[in-house]
Each structure stands twice: as C-alpha cells, then as structure tokens.
Amino acid sequence: MTSSRMNFDAVVVGSGACGGWAAKQLTEAGLRVLVLEAGRSESADKMLWTWHRLRQKVLRYRTETDERRKERQPIQSTTFAWPFHPHAFVDDVDNPYTTPDEQPFTWIRARQVGGRTSVKAHGRQFYRLSDFNFKAGSRDGHGPDWPLSLADLAPHYETVERWMGIRGNADGLDTLPDSVFTESIPMTPAEQRLKDAVERRWPERRVVVRRTASAPVTLPAALKTGRLTLRTHAVASQVLYDEKTGRATGVAYVDAETGKTYEAHGRIVVLAAGTIESTRLLLHSRSSAFPDGLANTSGQLGRNLMDHTYLLGLEARMNLPAEHQRAEQSWAYIPQFRNVSESAHDFARGYGVQVFTFGDQCHFVPFGEMVPSGDNRVTLSTTVKDRWGIPAAHIDCKHSDNDVKMSRDAVATCQEMMKEAGFTVEKVNDTLSTPGMAIHEVGTARMGSDRKTSVLNPYNQSWDVPNLFVTDGSCFVSQGPQNPTLTMMALTVRACDYMVGELKSGRL
C-alpha cells in the first residue's frame, strides 16, 4: 500500500457548491488549499455551455449506451436529470449503500468537479430561508431552532447572490426574503394569469417568478489565485485525528483509478462532500477518543436526516390563446402559505409549489418540509463496502404521518389553484415519492447552540474538534420548503470568514 503526504493550510473534501465556495474564499484570503474530488474533472467552459443547450434539449432515453448505463446505475437512472448527463452520476455497483427491507431511500449522487450543481439538469432555483424557517422549532415545538437568524446570514447570502448574479423580482415577502437581484424577470402571460387568479381568491397565497442563476462555478476563481490544488479521483476514506492535540490533521484518501492510498495534511479540514457522504466519512473516522464517529460526543451524528417530500405533481392544459403559448419552458414559485399566520391544519410546517409552464401545458410540483426526527438517520453498513473497501452508508429514513397529510393537502390545493386559473387538470400524480427523490437531503450533523444536542456550533465548527468544519447540507437544523443550495453556500461563506479570522487570531 503506497502512501504519500501533502501539507496545506486547508483540506476541503468535495468540489460542489459548498466545496467550491470554500476553495474560493480560503484561497482568496491567502490560504493554500487542497480540494479532494472523488470524481473526474469537467471544464468550466463546458459546464457553462450546457445551460444554454438545456433550453433546447428535450428529455429522452435513446441509445444502447443508456441501457448499458442502467445496468451500472439502477438508482441514479431513476432521477429526471440522469438522461441529460449520465456520466456525471455515480456507478451504483461501485458505490453501494443499504436501507432497511421495504424502506427504500433514493440517494442521487454526482461525482465530478462541481458536484450536482454541474449536472446539466440542475434546477437552478435559489431561495433564501427566513426567520420563519430558522425559528420554526420555537413556534411549533417540532425540533430546535437554528442557532442563527436571517440577520446573521444576510451578508453572506448577499456575497453569493452578487457573485452568481441572481435574477428575480423583489416581492417583499417575510417568508421568502428577497435576494440581491442583478436582473428582473418578467412574468409570462400564463404566470400572470395564474397569479391574478390565485391572489384574487386567496390573498395569503402568492405567485412569484423564479429566482435563478447559472451554475455556481467557483473553482476557476480559486485556481486563478495560484493557491489551489485540485486532486480528482480522490475518494476520502477517513479524517485523520491526533488524540494528543485533539485536532484533525488531514484526510486519508484512495486514488479511485490506482487504488493507492494517500494522506493530505492541513491546519483546517472542511467537509463539503454532501450531506450523507460527509456524515459517512465522520462515522468511519473512529478512534478510541471517538468510538461512535469523529466529533460525535453529542450522539447526534447521522440523526435527523431530511429530504423534501416530493410529488411528481399535477399536469394541466392552460387553455391559452396561441399568441400566449411559449415553446421555451418557464417556471414560477408559490411559497409556503399553510401554517404561516395560523396553524389550523392537521400537519406541521408546510410546502411550496414549483410551477413549470411550456406551450399550453402546466406542471405543479409541491415540495414539502420534512420535520426533523432522530429516527431518520445514517449509520454504517456492517456488511457492505464500496469498491475501495470503505463501509457503505446505511440509510434508515421514512415518511411520517405528517408528511402524508401535508402531501394530501398539497394535491388538493394545487388542483383548486389550477381550476381557479381556468386550467384543465389532466393528470394528478398523488403518490408520495421515495425519500431522497427530491435530491434536497440535509441534516445528520446539525449545528446548534448546545454541544450536548448538536454536532456543530453556529459557525459550522465541530464542538469536539476545533479545526474541523462541516459546511454542506448536513449542518441543517430544519429545512423549510425552499431549495437548500443558496443557504448551503451562504453558510459556507460565513464559516470561511470565521475560519480566516480564527487563524489570524491564532486560535486555530
């Protein structure tokens, strides 16, 4: 077994939305950074080019190659995005995971530079969370509050939004805070018709245009500093820990192509490999000091896994005049309206609805908030390992009665809004999808203000290992119904600002 050491100021695991931002912020602050990416590289130019192509591309399954890929990707090929970019997703045979019998979880993974944000069919919807979300626990009693507020995160949201160039409109909603927009987006005739009808009948329901941007391709900016080293095909296996100092010393990883093992050492370790992957890595990083996983004295590591409840939705014909029908897809958003000013429903939290229109067709897709539960969790399989000998994740997650009740309500409200707008409902998909299918998984290493009940402090720093940070979705306390990526990136920027300050002060 070959071993090699490398030394850096920071070692970042993962090159997706969060890992890319960590690399950018830390290198621009003067740090020498190593990014470990388990997959291959794809040029930034190609990633940007795909967004323009997607406007014209039609989803289709087509070649024998696709069929052969299904043999290696029986799970990955279940997502709508797979036909656009099959090679971006993992090989399920090489990268197995387990679930309880009759309790599936669909874990969609992209291993390449840029992570899932570089997949050609990434949704590109970027919404802020609000204090309505951050303080949900104290309002309804379902889980703790976040240890921060919108005011704490707003400057970091703004950093991300300005750099990405978020497009959208200022709507002035407390539950869906406005971003800093570089460009407004006019409503299509179909969206305006829906907005007028819904808001006239139900003033508490709002229809807004999407908030969108191109993929957050941050690594080129980090590379320009000359302080970034990017290592692809590097499968992280353990976070290295020194029991004498009580600190992480780096990351052990396997070269996916040669099978050789390496160690990368750094003053700081940042995990941004994705919710389940980062947690799996910590669980596997056991020692006499941390027999249940690194940084797990709270016992919360792996618990409170959440993914949005997801319905394939409802389809309708809009009955638009020909001059108002658009060949190009557009989409709008209906933010949460249940349990906002009152809680008269038989379920907690709420859902948002993504509205897609093209031609004379309309598609409503509700995404609901899963209430955190310690029983929904990630552990390590005792029998299954991946191709490189690393124990596979065991994912135990199921929908609750609350999820089912919320989804039933979502189907009913979507139908009534479609009908109010004069649309003809043609198809109702009311089956709740398998957990994981929303591809918005969060939780499992939550932040908090009490080290006894959380894995991380409010700056994404491990309570137990001070130079270890986890900045991806695993830090989430609750999820809200909004897409999580913008919040993940803002939290990463905030954590990096904190890291740099701690390094300068000599505390790290």
Where are these regions (language model features)?
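A short, basic/flexible loop-to-alpha-helix module at the beginning of a structural domain
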Residues: 1-7
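Glycine-rich loop(s) and the adjacent beta-strand/alpha-helix scaffold that form part
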Residues: 28, 32-58, 62, 238-245, ...
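A conserved FAD-binding loop/helix module that cradles the flavin
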Residues: 478-496
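Conserved redox-cofactor binding core of oxidoreductases
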Residues: 59-91, 96-112, 116-131, 135-240, ...
